[in-house]
Design a protein with these regions (language model features):
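Conserved alpha/beta-domain cores
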Residues: 2-157
């Protein structure tokens, strides 16, 4: 069984612990675990970490911050795609159309990167068949926490 270790990209000591752990793959996180105002610093920290450490053949899939800011998305992808990483995790994938834009942007910068869509909604789950058919994907990830927040399950009174 494989384990994937998510770690905030702004916390260097956690990245180093992950690198030295027995985990199968590291997911340095630029999304939920990093406050919005320091995401750019976290990206730079992650770049420095990857460039200045012996990665010991560790599989690394950074999770980008998927936002409405296309310039920020392209900055993350352009800077990460030239590093010694295996791929990128794309959070909040709901449909093939929006995923296609990110998929094509990543492939523009590095055609060899694995792209992992993170399904975190009912809409994303409903569209999973189209995502699988429409793209060359080897891995799909499921975010149960955000998904469960969207389910119509309220408190019992």
């Amino acid at each position: 069984m494989s384990s994937y270790l998510f770690s905030p990209a702004n916390v260097s000591k956690n990245l180093i612990k992950g690198l030295n752990s027995d985990t199968f793959a590291m997911i340095p996180d630029l999304e939920d675990s990093v406050p919005l105002e320091i995401k750019s610093n976290a990206l730079n920290n992650l770049i420095d970490f990857i460039n200045n450490n012996d990665l010991n053949n560790k599989i690394i899939y950074p999770r980008i911050h998927n936002s409405d800011d296309n310039t920020w998305i392209e900055e993350q992808i352009s800077k990460l795609s030239v590093l010694n990483i295996n791929g990128l995790v794309i959070p909040g994938v709901n449909d093939p159309k929006s995923f296609s834009k990110l998929y094509n942007l990543i492939k523009k910068y590095n055609n060899n990167l694995e792209i992992i869509p993170l399904i975190e909604s009912v809409e994303g789950l409903d569209n999973m068949k189209d995502l699988i058919r429409g793209f060359n994907l080897n891995i799909i990830s499921f975010g149960k926490y955000d998904f469960s927040l969207m389910l119509p399950v309220g408190e019992v009174e």
